[in-house]
Amino acid sequence: MATTTQPINLFEFEDAAKELLPKQEYDYIAGGATDEISVDRNRRAYASWAFRPRVLRDVSKLDLSTTVLGSRVELPVLIAPCGGHKRAHPEGELATYRAAASCGTVLAVSANANTSFEDLAKAANGSLWVQLYPFRDKAMTQDWLDRAKANGYKAIVVTLDSQWPPKRERNIRNRYQRTRGANYPAGGEHPDAPRPAGSGAGSDPAATWKDLEWIKAATSLPVVAKGVMTGEDVELCAEVGADGVIVSNHGGRHLDNTLATVEVLSEAVAAAKGKMEVLLDGGIRRGAVVVKAIALGANAVFIGRPLFWGLAVGGEQGVVRVLNLLREEIEITMAKCGRPSISSIDSSAIVKAPAL
């Protein structure tokens, strides 16, 4: 590890990473849209639920494994599609993927990854998903879908909440310039900003549900819709055949003043009606909140920013440490609540807590 004292929680990982990263890179990762209210709310909202611990239950053997899209994972914490891992460590996504594989979980590879889909697939024997946008360029979309299938990727994540660029004031002050992802064709457009229709491979501001339906029809891989925050949109995802949804407000990076993702999770689960898996990201900094999310109906959760803190502090082993800290805290919470397996965690494990 790069620091003399090893972080013992994810908050300390962030503190250590802040000291190591250039200011503009730290701000890019940590920052959010406008006043960053949703960034903070995502984390704090979990305090609205409290545990109902049960005693005298056999917790001598704890099982943190579960299934996501039919595949077994050893930890109900997946790594979200976040672009540009090399901003935190020279090995970038290669280090992240090796860490995810060694911990038995999934890496969802961002459209803006610094590493090609092919090079990543060779780096470890783990589980990879590919994330993309509703691009204007259907030929490029089909190419990505075909490359994902050919290289053994297990699912497609389609990000739906990025049709218009956000205002991130930290980036404006720092005059931050993003680098192009490794998987775009030479001269292809970055999908960060809307442009006139037909202008290239950007994220399409004119995209509709027909675009998600087209992607679903264009691949045999499971399709997961990311960026859904209402029951109505969960129902529409089901109508076009999505296999899962990720309840996400993009970590508070696109639209400020939304509810926290955990605050809309129950609505999403109810709307899914058991037809799709419901996943969640946003504000995961403790193992205890992973258990709360599962109790509210999530199949599993994703982390985003913490993977960068792990990379910055210790590369591959830093990400392993981040995941293992969450594993340790999940185990403690499960044992203390009398829930020996992920499947034993249900709504009776928590209660809505009155405000302090």
What residue spans do the PLM features occupy?
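C-terminal helical cap(s) of enzyme catalytic domains, especially alpha/beta-barrels
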Residues: 42, 257-268, 311-331
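Glycine-rich active-site/cofactor-binding loop and its immediate structural neighborhood
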Residues: 73-112, 117
